[in-house]
Amino acid sequence: MSAIRYGDNVFITLPRLSTPMIFNGLVPHYTKPNQYEYVPILSSGSIANGDSYIIEPININNSNTALNPQSVFRLKQVSQNKYLYDNNGIVYLGNDTDNKANWSLKPVNLNATTIDYNQEFRLVNQGTGNNAVFSTINNVTMITSKYNDTTNNSIFKFLKGPFTYAQSQCCQGNILYTRPNMCGIYKQGSSVCHTIPSSQSNYPSYTTSMVGSTQSTTPVGSNPPTHRSIDKWYIIGGIFWVIVLIILVIFIIWKLK
C-alpha cells in the first residue's frame, strides 16, 4: 500500500459522515460585520469539484519522506496558496504559517507506525492540540476544532491527487476512491472513462483482491494502435474507391462519344 508522503497532492475527505464530504473551495466567514476570514467549503461532491492540497513539510529536508504519527506538516491549498490553520476553535484558510498552521495525523488504528492512503486518521493541530471536526453552525458546514474529539466527525482520509491521477484511479475502479464514492461521473466502464489514460497504481482495484497490484499504464494522449490502424485503412480504402469511380465515369463518357 502506498505511503502518504511530504509533497503529495491530496484531496481531503471525511468518509465516516452519513453523507461523506470532500473539501472543495473556500468562502468568507464573517467574524465581525466588516471583517472576515476564509474557511474551506465542504460538499458531498466528488473529485470533479474537489479542492486539492499539498502536504508541505515544515523542514525542507523532509521532502518526499513517508509520514508517520509524529510527522508535522502544513496543508496548502493548491488553487489559492492558502494554509489550513486553527484559530479560536474554527479552521480557516489563510497566509498564517505559525504553529497553528501545523498539523499531524493520528491514525484511527493506534498501532500504526506509518500512514498509507488506506488509513483513516484525525488531524491534530500542533498549536492548539485540538482535532479538526466537521460541524454545522447556523446551517453552514465548516471545520471547527475540539480537544480529543472521538466522533466520526473528526475522521479524515486523504485521496491521492492531482485530479488527473485521481480521475484515472476512479476509472480503474480503485476502491480507495469508490468506497465511499468520491468519483462522481468517473465510474469504471462509463463512457467518460474511455478517453482517460490509466495511471500506475499501487492500490487495490475493485476487480481484484490483490493488494499492491500494478495497473497497466497507457501514455497520456495516446490511443490504442489498433484503432489508428483501422482508421488508416478506412481512409486508404475510401481513396481507392473514389479513384475507381472517377475512372469508370471517364470510361462511360468516352464510350458515349
UniProtKB/Swiss-Prot annotation:
Glycosylation site residues: 61, 95, 102, 111, 139, 148, 152
Record has Cytoplasm as a keyword: no
Entry membrane topology: Single-pass membrane protein
Chain segments annotated as transmembrane: 233-253
Keywords noted in UniProt: Glycoprotein, Host membrane, Membrane, Transmembrane, Transmembrane helix, Virion
The keyword Transmembrane helix belongs to this UniProt entry's keyword annotation: yes
Cellular component GO terms held in the UniProt record: host cell membrane; membrane; virion component
Principal location class: host cell
Subcellular location: Host membrane; Virion
Name under which the protein is recorded: Uncharacterized protein L778
